[in-house]
Amino acid sequence: HVDYFLHTVLIGAETVENEIRTIQCADDEGLFTVSAKAFVDATGDANLSRLAGAKLIWGNDGGHPQAATLTFRLSGVAADVDLSPAAVERAVVRAKAEGIRNLTREKGFILRMENSGIVHVLLPSIIPEGLSAEEMTRMERETRKQVLGYLQALRTYMPGMEHSELAVIGPSIGFRETRKLVGKE
Protein backbone atom coordinates (compact mmCIF):
# COMPACT_ATOMS: atom_id res chain seq x y z
CA HIS A 1 0.00 0.00 0.00
CA VAL A 2 1.40 3.41 -1.00
CA ASP A 3 0.11 6.70 0.37
CA TYR A 4 0.97 10.10 -0.96
CA PHE A 5 -0.06 13.61 -0.01
CA LEU A 6 -0.57 16.65 -2.18
CA HIS A 7 -0.47 20.21 -0.78
CA THR A 8 2.23 19.14 1.66
CA VAL A 9 5.69 20.54 2.37
CA LEU A 10 8.50 18.26 3.51
CA ILE A 11 10.35 19.95 6.39
CA GLY A 12 12.48 17.26 8.03
CA ALA A 13 13.67 13.68 8.10
CA GLU A 14 14.76 11.43 10.96
CA THR A 15 17.35 8.80 10.14
CA VAL A 16 18.78 5.91 12.10
CA GLU A 17 21.98 4.32 10.76
CA ASN A 18 21.57 6.04 7.36
CA GLU A 19 17.98 4.84 7.00
CA ILE A 20 15.03 7.22 6.92
CA ARG A 21 12.55 6.27 9.64
CA THR A 22 10.17 9.25 9.64
CA ILE A 23 9.60 12.46 7.76
CA GLN A 24 8.14 15.68 9.09
CA CYS A 25 5.69 17.55 6.92
CA ALA A 26 3.50 20.63 7.03
CA ASP A 27 0.16 21.43 5.47
CA ASP A 28 -2.41 24.16 6.05
CA GLU A 29 -3.57 22.42 9.24
CA GLY A 30 -0.11 22.22 10.83
CA LEU A 31 2.76 19.78 11.26
CA PHE A 32 2.60 16.00 11.05
CA THR A 33 4.97 13.03 10.97
CA VAL A 34 4.90 10.08 8.59
CA SER A 35 6.51 6.72 9.39
CA ALA A 36 7.16 4.11 6.71
CA LYS A 37 9.34 1.14 5.83
CA ALA A 38 10.58 3.01 2.76
CA PHE A 39 10.43 6.52 1.32
CA VAL A 40 10.83 7.68 -2.27
CA ASP A 41 12.38 11.08 -2.89
CA ALA A 42 10.15 12.38 -5.68
CA THR A 43 10.78 16.04 -4.87
CA GLY A 44 12.72 16.68 -8.07
CA ASP A 45 15.42 18.57 -6.17
CA ALA A 46 16.59 15.80 -3.80
CA ASN A 47 14.97 17.59 -0.86
CA LEU A 48 14.33 14.40 1.12
CA SER A 49 17.83 13.15 0.39
CA ARG A 50 19.30 16.46 1.59
CA LEU A 51 17.25 16.44 4.79
CA ALA A 52 18.34 12.83 5.43
CA GLY A 53 22.01 13.79 5.08
CA ALA A 54 22.73 12.00 1.81
CA LYS A 55 25.70 12.97 -0.32
CA LEU A 56 24.58 15.31 -3.11
CA ILE A 57 26.06 17.28 -5.98
CA TRP A 58 24.81 20.56 -7.40
CA GLY A 59 24.17 20.48 -11.14
CA ASN A 60 26.53 18.50 -13.34
CA ASP A 61 29.83 16.94 -12.29
CA GLY A 62 31.42 20.39 -12.54
CA GLY A 63 28.85 21.94 -10.21
CA HIS A 64 26.96 23.81 -12.93
CA PRO A 65 23.18 23.27 -13.23
CA GLN A 66 21.17 23.79 -16.38
CA ALA A 67 19.18 27.00 -16.68
CA ALA A 68 15.73 27.22 -15.13
CA THR A 69 12.98 28.60 -17.38
CA LEU A 70 9.81 30.61 -16.83
CA THR A 71 7.39 30.01 -19.67
CA PHE A 72 4.67 32.37 -20.78
CA ARG A 73 1.82 32.34 -23.26
CA LEU A 74 0.85 34.96 -25.84
CA SER A 75 -2.49 35.30 -27.61
CA GLY A 76 -3.30 37.22 -30.78
CA VAL A 77 -0.35 35.86 -32.77
CA ALA A 78 -0.81 35.95 -36.55
CA ALA A 79 -1.22 32.59 -38.28
CA ASP A 80 1.66 33.20 -40.70
CA VAL A 81 4.33 34.34 -38.23
CA ASP A 82 7.70 32.58 -38.57
CA LEU A 83 8.25 30.87 -35.20
CA SER A 84 11.46 29.10 -36.17
CA PRO A 85 14.35 29.21 -33.69
CA ALA A 86 16.32 31.26 -36.23
CA ALA A 87 13.55 33.89 -36.44
CA VAL A 88 13.33 34.04 -32.64
CA GLU A 89 17.09 34.52 -32.39
CA ARG A 90 17.10 37.28 -35.04
CA ALA A 91 14.36 39.17 -33.19
CA VAL A 92 16.03 38.90 -29.78
CA VAL A 93 19.49 39.83 -31.09
CA ARG A 94 18.03 42.91 -32.76
CA ALA A 95 16.05 43.83 -29.63
CA LYS A 96 19.19 43.58 -27.50
CA ALA A 97 21.08 45.76 -29.97
CA GLU A 98 18.27 48.33 -29.79
CA GLY A 99 18.47 48.44 -25.98
CA ILE A 100 15.57 46.30 -24.80
CA ARG A 101 16.53 45.14 -21.33
CA ASN A 102 16.33 41.87 -19.42
CA LEU A 103 16.94 39.61 -22.42
CA THR A 104 19.31 36.97 -21.09
CA ARG A 105 19.44 34.56 -24.00
CA GLU A 106 18.96 34.81 -27.73
CA LYS A 107 17.99 31.21 -28.45
CA GLY A 108 14.70 29.72 -27.43
CA PHE A 109 11.49 28.21 -28.65
CA ILE A 110 8.03 29.47 -29.41
CA LEU A 111 5.44 26.74 -29.86
CA ARG A 112 2.00 27.34 -31.36
CA MET A 113 -1.08 25.68 -29.95
CA GLU A 114 -2.64 23.89 -32.89
CA ASN A 115 -5.10 25.96 -34.98
CA SER A 116 -4.92 28.99 -32.72
CA GLY A 117 -3.33 32.39 -32.26
CA ILE A 118 -1.83 31.23 -28.96
CA VAL A 119 1.86 30.43 -28.51
CA HIS A 120 4.00 29.18 -25.63
CA VAL A 121 7.29 31.05 -25.24
CA LEU A 122 10.31 29.36 -23.69
CA LEU A 123 12.90 32.14 -23.37
CA PRO A 124 13.15 33.69 -19.88
CA SER A 125 15.82 31.75 -18.02
CA ILE A 126 18.26 31.95 -15.16
CA ILE A 127 21.05 29.79 -13.74
CA PRO A 128 20.00 28.65 -10.25
CA GLU A 129 22.51 29.29 -7.48
CA GLY A 130 20.47 27.69 -4.71
CA LEU A 131 16.97 26.83 -3.59
CA SER A 132 16.51 29.01 -0.51
CA ALA A 133 13.41 31.19 -0.27
CA GLU A 134 15.61 34.23 -0.86
CA GLU A 135 17.20 32.74 -4.00
CA MET A 136 13.89 31.43 -5.35
CA THR A 137 12.32 34.87 -4.89
CA ARG A 138 15.25 36.53 -6.66
CA MET A 139 14.97 34.12 -9.60
CA GLU A 140 11.18 34.53 -9.85
CA ARG A 141 11.49 38.33 -9.86
CA GLU A 142 14.28 38.31 -12.44
CA THR A 143 12.55 35.95 -14.85
CA ARG A 144 9.27 37.89 -14.59
CA LYS A 145 11.18 41.03 -15.65
CA GLN A 146 12.53 38.99 -18.55
CA VAL A 147 8.98 38.09 -19.64
CA LEU A 148 8.23 41.79 -20.12
CA GLY A 149 11.46 42.30 -22.07
CA TYR A 150 10.78 39.35 -24.35
CA LEU A 151 7.20 40.48 -24.87
CA GLN A 152 8.46 43.88 -26.02
CA ALA A 153 11.13 42.27 -28.23
CA LEU A 154 8.72 39.86 -29.92
CA ARG A 155 6.04 42.50 -30.50
CA THR A 156 8.60 44.89 -31.98
CA TYR A 157 10.92 42.62 -33.98
CA MET A 158 8.88 39.55 -35.01
CA PRO A 159 6.46 40.34 -37.83
CA GLY A 160 3.05 38.92 -36.99
CA MET A 161 3.40 39.43 -33.25
CA GLU A 162 2.71 43.18 -33.17
CA HIS A 163 -0.76 42.70 -31.69
CA SER A 164 0.01 39.80 -29.40
CA GLU A 165 -1.03 40.01 -25.77
CA LEU A 166 0.39 38.44 -22.66
CA ALA A 167 -2.17 35.74 -21.80
CA VAL A 168 -0.49 34.03 -18.87
CA ILE A 169 2.86 33.68 -17.13
CA GLY A 170 3.79 30.28 -15.71
CA PRO A 171 3.14 29.93 -11.97
CA SER A 172 6.83 29.41 -11.17
CA ILE A 173 10.15 28.77 -12.81
CA GLY A 174 10.81 25.23 -13.99
CA PHE A 175 14.03 23.44 -13.17
CA ARG A 176 15.80 20.88 -15.30
CA GLU A 177 18.62 20.22 -12.88
CA THR A 178 19.57 21.26 -9.35
CA ARG A 179 20.67 18.86 -6.59
CA LYS A 180 21.34 15.24 -7.46
CA LEU A 181 21.93 12.23 -5.26
CA VAL A 182 25.38 10.69 -5.49
CA GLY A 183 24.98 6.97 -6.05
CA LYS A 184 27.47 4.29 -5.14
CA GLU A 185 31.00 5.49 -5.67
Predicted regions mapped to residue ranges:
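Flavin (FAD/FMN)-binding glycine-rich loop and adjacent Rossmann-like elements that form
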Residues: 6-10, 26-27, 31-38, 42-185
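N-terminal Rossmann-like dinucleotide/flavin-binding domain of flavoprotein oxidoreductases
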Residues: 1-4
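A conserved short coil-to-beta-strand element within the FAD-binding core of flavoproteins
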Residues: 6-21
